[in-house]
């Protein structure tokens, strides 16, 4: 068998934008910056919020003239039948 074929397994830190620091191991040689973690992700916290780091949601809403609190009416299936 060949020797030294596996990469080194280093201890790194993952820094979340909420301030949480996660210590883990990886083959990377650098620390990570992440947007969400288990403490701030909407699935785990049970809250709904929009994570928009580049203004993409505002651009989309502006382009299609949508507001965040718009009431969407269900499409009547009877009108689509011929």
UniProtKB/Swiss-Prot annotation:
Pfam families linked to this entry: Ribosomal_L31
Residues the entry annotates as binding Zn(2+): 16, 18, 37, 40
SUPFAM superfamilies: L28p-like
Keywords: Metal-binding, Ribonucleoprotein, Ribosomal protein, RNA-binding, rRNA-binding, Zinc
Essential cofactor(s): Zn(2+)
Quaternary structure note: Part of the 50S ribosomal subunit.
Protein's recorded name: Large ribosomal subunit protein bL31
Source organism per UniProt: Blochmanniella pennsylvanica (strain BPEN)
């Amino acid at each position: 068998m060949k020797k030294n074929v596996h990469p080194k397994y280093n201890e790194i830190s993952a820094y979340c934008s909420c301030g949480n620091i996660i210590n883990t191991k990886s083959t990377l040689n650098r620390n990570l910056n992440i947007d969400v973690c288990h403490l701030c992700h909407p699935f785990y916290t049970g809250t709904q919020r929009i994570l928009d780091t580049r203004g993409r949601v505002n651009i989309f809403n502006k382009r299609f003239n949508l507001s965040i609190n718009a009431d969407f009416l269900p499409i009547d299936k009877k009108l689509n039948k011929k």
